[in-house]
Amino acid sequence: MAKVNLYISNDAYEKINAIIEKRRQEGAREKDVSFSATASMLLELGLRVYEAQMERKESAFNQAEFNKLLLECVVKTQSTVAKILGIESLSPHVSGNPKFEYSNMVEDIREKVSVEMERFFPKNDDE
């Protein structure tokens, strides 16, 4: 095991001591919660977080490109469904039934979407 001397801020020192004190209060043994062991554990954890962030940066996933593609597919689907609804509303099998008139179908869809959106994105009083 390598030995390293380093300087840390007073804030970091106090936070490490707080972790040690908390573990001791929880019943940990003195040798298991030394300053050296705790600082080493935090350093290793920090290195893993750093490596994970670097891997994410190198990944081929591009959030902006994904969002663009997703929006494009949603718009295509919306346009296609609107055309299908228009065609369906002209069908002789449903003619005269107000439930299947295009404007009524559109309004019904908007109401249902509004209810579902409200579940996930409640309106604020500010809006």
UniProtKB/Swiss-Prot annotation:
Record's keyword terms, sorted: Conjugation, Cytoplasm, DNA-binding, Plasmid, Transcription, Transcription regulation
The keyword Isomerase is annotated on this UniProt entry: no
Cell compartment(s), UniProt: Cytoplasm
SUPFAM superfamilies from the UniProt entry: IHF-like DNA-binding proteins, TraM-like
Entries under Gene3D superfamilies matching the protein: 1.10.287.2320, TraM protein, DNA-binding
Top-level lineage group: Bacteria
GO molecular function annotations of the record: DNA binding
Free-text function comment from the UniProt entry: Conjugative DNA transfer (CDT) is the unidirectional transfer of ssDNA plasmid from a donor to a recipient cell. It is the central mechanism by which antibiotic resistance and virulence factors are propagated in bacterial populations. Part of the relaxosome, which facilitates a site- and strand-specific cut in the origin of transfer by TraI, at the nic site. Probably autoregulates its own expression. Plasmid specificity is conferred by the TraD-TraM pair.
Protein name: Relaxosome protein TraM
